[in-house]
Each structure stands twice: as C-alpha cells, then as structure tokens.
Regions:
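ATP-binding N-lobe of GHMP and related small-molecule kinases
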Residues: 1-97, 111, 115, 119, ...
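FAD-binding core of FAD-dependent oxidoreductases
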Residues: 11-13, 17-26, 98-106, 134-149
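Hydrophobic alpha-helical segments
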Residues: 22, 29, 33, 105, ...
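A general structural signal for well-ordered alpha-helical segments in protein cores
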Residues: 64-71, 106, 142, 172, ...
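Residues within well-formed alpha-helices
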Residues: 69-70, 108, 112, 129, ...
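ATP-dependent small-molecule kinase catalytic core of the GHMP/sugar-kinase superfamily
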Residues: 122-201
Length: 201
C-alpha cells in the first residue's frame, strides 16, 4: 500500500501572535509513504528537490530524518515499530526560510502513516505528536487543518485551536532570503520577556 500526501507551507508569528498565529500558504511538500513488499529491507528515505536549490542535502536520509521520527512516534503510540517502509520527500518549500518546511513534512509523514495503519490517531492525537517534535503548534496546526489559525498547548500537552476567516481580497507576498536561518538562531535575538501590554493573552 502507498499513500501520497500534499501539505502546505505555513507562516507563523503573525503580528503579535507569537507562537500562536499561523497561516497555510499555497506552496506544497509531498510525502509518499509505502509499505515495501520484501521483509528485512528496513527504512528507505528518498529526497527529491523541486526548489532548484542545494538545501535538500542537509536533510538526513536515515533514522534521524524528522519524517521518520514522526512516523516512529505514531507507530509507538499504538505499540508498534515502523519497518519495511519507503519514504519519499518531494520538497517545494524552501528549507530554513521561515515557511514551515519541517512542520509540513512532519504533518505529511504522520497523515500518510496514519492512513497506512488504518487511521488509529484522530486529529487531536496527530496535533499532539507533531507538536512534540516542533515544540510549538503555530506552524503545525495550519499545516494540518489549513487556513488561518490561532493555537496553543494545554497543560496536558493537547493542542487547541480556532480557525479564522482570511479576507478573500488579501493577497500574500512572501520574500525568501538566499540564506538559511534556523528557528533556534532567529529566536536567540528575541527578548526573554514581553510585557502583558504587548503579548497575546
């Protein structure tokens, strides 16, 4: 059985909505997960770069791959271990450019694997597993449910969200730099505290 999933890019931290507001964009990664016929073949991960860049070479093709990690978490949640899987990642979303490339492939891997397993996980479980890998749901949630979303993590680790109507006459322009900037480095320049007056409650 083979499952192919297209997942959108996302942009987050819109306006004052730090770690909470996110918006799906019409650029897509495609994740294909296939059960291989021959036992003992293990996990095979293939990368196809559709961005005309060399960024894809930074993506691991072993068990350190974030798609594999997401799939492994889903399998483990139902007491199974992934084996004999062929995973293909087709990237149209630039990597490390603020467009949620990691959220896209995490969500894509989870949805595809969930289909292979007969849908044991509901939306809430998928959000929880994906956020475990991303730490914040602001890119994960719109990647999974689409649209413009405000989301947060409850004390029990579950993700709650509310979708907002995006005005039809609002266009989106995305400026993509020609250099990588990881989320961790971008966050390092931010203040440790923000006053209540400036924050989202």
């Amino acid at each position: 059985m083979k499952v192919s999933v297209k997942i959108p890019a996302t942009t987050a931290n819109l306006g004052p909505g730090f770690d909470s507001f996110g918006l799906a964009l019409p650029i897509f990664n495609t994740i294909i997960v296939e059960e291989t016929i021959m036992p003992g073949t293990g996990i095979e991960i293939n990368l196809i770069d559709e961005t005309n860049s060399q960024d894809i070479i930074s993506i691991p093709t072993d068990e350190n791959n974030i798609v594999y990690k997401a799939i492994e978490l889903l399998y483990n949640s139902i007491g199974q271990v992934p084996s004999e899987l062929k995973i293909t990642i087709k990237t149209q979303i630039p990597i490390a450019r603020g467009l949620g490339s990691s959220a896209s492939i995490i969500v894509g891997g989870l949805i595809a694997a969930n289909e292979l397993l007969g849908r044991p996980a509901d939306e809430a479980a998928l959000l929880s597993i994906a956020t475990e890998l991303e730490d914040h749901p602001d890119n994960i949630t719109p990647a999974l449910v689409g649209g413009c979303v405000v989301s947060s993590i409850e004390e029990d680790g579950s993700v709650v969200y509310s979708k907002m109507n995006w005005p039809r006459d609002w266009a989106i322009t995305v400026c993509v730099p020609d250099y990588e900037l990881s989320t961790s480095i971008a966050r390092s320049v931010l203040p440790k505290e923000v006053s209540d007056r400036k924050s989202v409650v």
